[in-house]
Amino acid sequence: MSINSYADNRPGFVCGQFNKNIIEVPGEYVFPFAEYEGYSYFDPRFIENKKGCEANFRVLPMRMSWSDLKPSNEVSNDVKIIEVYAEPLKGNPEKYLSYRKYVYLDMGYLKRKGELYYDEELDLYFTEVTVTIRRSIGHKDDMYFNKKGYYWKEINNEVIFLIECEWLPIDEKYHKCFQYFLIPEIGTKVKFYFDAKELSNSNIMREKIRIFLLDHVKN
């Protein structure tokens, strides 16, 4: 039996709950598999976890093509893929992303934050954060610099969504990003990964993913 098919689900669908909201999606979207509350994936008792529409999701991972949001596990230069991870939202949704921004940008003494800019084209705030890491190679110490770029949107001093992009030193450009956003009405936080070249489309991606999940709420 497939890990994505359970006795209390419709055949070919994956079902579970986020904060008492039942979500059911076609199994072709789910990659590699949904995790439910209970034992960790690394625990042999993982297979004993309650599954299906009455169980709580720990994470619902999905892969889909852009821009039609069709299920896709294909690895090809001709197919643009976005990876989506939906998890239960815990705590106050009004402060969640503001705190997440603080953690990414300010927490930790090894971080060096760049100047704050406002990107007029994207209509987003932007700054860079560099973490200096000392590495021992043989008998020598080497300094490694890990740089990431952050974009975010604020309304009434609250962060609405947050984007992190990884810097690729060898190419001297950002190459992969993820965006965090919330869907409070179904008690869900969402992270999705996309190519940095699609940054200008990330607002459309977020809205399409939000609608996709809301459309798959099971009444």
Outline where the language-model segments fall.
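Long, compositionally biased interface segments
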Residues: 166-219
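N-terminal export/ancillary region detector
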Residues: 1-152, 156
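Short, Gly/Ser/Thr-enriched beta-strand-loop segments that form substrate-interacting elements
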Residues: 146-147, 152-175
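Short acidic/polar mixed-charge low-complexity motifs
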Residues: 21, 158-159, 186-188
